[in-house]
Amino acid sequence: MTTGALPCCFGGQTMKLEGFGIFVKDMATMVRFYRDVLGFEIKEDENTSNVFLEKDGTLFLLYRRSDFENMTNTKFHYAEKINGHYEIALSVENYSAVDKTYSEVLEKGAKSVMSPTTEPWGQRTCYISDPEGNLIEIGSFVK
């Protein structure tokens, strides 16, 4: 039996996760939210069709929907309101930091989806959404 992760290779090349992105309708609003509310660092000009942000070494791309559709010559359908297709998971130091961070991001304009609660598996967690309804979890396993 093998333990640990096996490297994934394609044509002799290793593939690794560098970051992730979401397609956005209102670039300015979304840049402000991730920068000012959640503390992401902007890595390039924020007035382009895609904006790279970074949080703790992970790249996070905001890509303007209309520009992507023009590039691919395809019309896509997007979720409205709260989007339950995925979450962006952020961790904080401990249980009390979950509560404090939740209060702070609500004061800065995040929308509450679920207030802090301690789950049976030992995680204290809460959910907020960004201005376009993407779910964001803030949690910790440290009491």
Regions found by a protein language model. Name each.
Residues I22-K25, E93:
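Residue-level signal for the nucleotide or nucleotide-sugar donor/cofactor binding architecture
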Residues G21, A28, D99:
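Conserved catalytic core of two-component sensor histidine kinases
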Residues M30-R35, V105, D130-G133:
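Conserved active-site tyrosine of GNAT-family acetyltransferases
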Residues C8-E18, E41-S129, S140-K143:
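Vicinal oxygen chelate
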Residues V24-M27, P120-W121:
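Conserved beta-strand-loop-alpha-helix junction that forms the acyl-donor binding cleft
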